[in-house]
A protein has these predicted regions:
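Long, charged/polar, soluble alpha-helical segments
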Residues: 1-153
Length: 153
């Protein structure tokens, strides 16, 4: 869930992709900071809500970037900016998850995995066209020996 004021501000900058991404990442970072503060105070419900808003903003940023042409240098720069932000957020999410009770930590772990997958997507977008992937290995069936008959001398 993205807050109405944040969505309005992001929509106002939708023509300028770098500015919109920077704004989105600032909002996401703010929610993550507030989640850390709530976690430190033991207010895990509010921390979960802030982590959910962080998740929504990262998801929105990935959807926004997916509309651009992947081979463009500008698009790769945007993905790199997103990847760097997500790289910094990973340890913060992990630290919160470790001090959070299990019933709330499950959701933080889910967002942590989502952020890791988002970072992977950003890296794949950045390097995807230059990486040579190994071909898939096809396993050959193991031949079964034919049993010998006892009728032979």
């Amino acid at each position: 869930m993205i807050v109405k004021e944040e969505r309005a501000e992001m929509d106002a900058t939708s023509k300028d992709a770098p500015k919109r991404l920077k704004l989105t990442m600032e909002f996401a970072g703010g929610h993550l900071t507030r989640a850390e503060q709530h976690t430190g105070r033991g207010d895990y419900e509010a921390a979960s809500a802030e982590v959910g808003m962080y998740h929504a903003l990262i998801e929105n940023a990935l959807e926004f970037l997916s509309t651009f042409k992947r081979d463009s240098n500008k698009t790769r720069d945007l993905y790199k900016r997103l990847e760097m932000a997500l790289r910094a957020d990973g340890p913060r999410l992990t630290a919160m998850r470790r001090i959070t009770p299990l019933e709330f930590a499950v959701w933080i772990k889910q967002v942590e995995d989502f952020a890791r997958d988002g970072r992977t997507e950003a890296l794949n977008s950045f390097y995807g066209h230059t990486v040579v992937h190994d071909p898939e290995k096809v396993e050959k069936p193991i031949p079964t020996p034919t049993p010998k008959s006892n009728n032979q001398p």
